[in-house]
Regions:
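Non-catalytic structural scaffold of enzyme domains
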Residues: 1-220
Length: 220
């Protein structure tokens, strides 16, 4: 978000966090499609140029299954490296999605590890500083992967801690590809020096704005 704020000059960026339906990771594909449709409708009155599903779980489970209502949709999807042994860390729902099943079928060197509850633990850490027992949650994973794909937009927040557990791994995230797609989807960018305006909508708007101003989303 911070990079978009500085890159997309003169734009208004709306951020909505769907706390009402969390967690996404334990929901079925059909449930996630309904949630995506409902949340997309919240943005339509603002006539957005682009709507971003900034969640791997939502992105992988709704690909080709949602009505974009004439709006450009950008999704955050897991990234892999062909021909290199890798580990995809993700939610249970992401692991069960058709997208990841196909990804696994096409990449025999890819292991998929759904980490139950990790996204929620990261939320608790962000909100109240509760320590995450990463080593315990990932105790069954090998430590010698060539790369680790962060298949949840929460996971980059703890990348430094993950690096301690996977010291040999390169870390990948689909967020970079999504960022490029967002920037390319905006056809007019002001040349003035002022950045974009970031607005938070929904019941938790005030709390999100506070966290954002504290730099919690600096790497998100």
């Amino acid at each position: 978000m911070r990079r978009l704020e500085h890159t997309l000059k003169g734009q208004t960026l709306l951020y909505y966090a769907d706390f009402e339906n969390l967690p996404y990771g334990n929901k079925s594909g059909d449930e996630l499609v309904k949630i995506a449709e409902k949340n997309l409708e919240k943005f339509l009155p603002f006539c957005p140029k682009t709507v971003v599903f900034a969640c791997n779980t939502l992105s992988t489970n709704t690909l080709g299954k949602t009505n974009p209502h004439g709006v450009r949709l950008v999704r955050v999807l897991p990234k892999v490296k062909v021909g290199k042994r890798g580990l995809l860390l993700c939610t249970e729902a992401t692991a069960n999605s058709d997208y990841v099943r196909l990804l696994k079928k096409e990449n025999s060197l890819l292991d998929v590890l759904p980490v139950k509850g990790l996204a929620e633990e990261i939320e608790k850490w962000v909100r109240c500083g509760k320590k995450i027992n990463l080593e315990g949650m990932l105790r069954c994973a090998d430590r010698d992967y060539g790369y680790v794909s962060l298949g949840c937009t929460h996971y980059p927040i703890i990348q430094a801690e993950l690096k301690k557990l996977f010291p040999l791994a390169e870390f990948l995230s689909g967020e970079e590809d999504a960022f490029d797609k967002i920037v390319n989807s905006v056809t007019t960018i002001d040349t003035d020096d002022h950045g974009s305006e970031v607005c938070f909508i929904g019941k938790e708007a005030k709390m999100l704005k506070t966290l954002y101003n504290k730099g919690i989303f600096e790497n998100v």
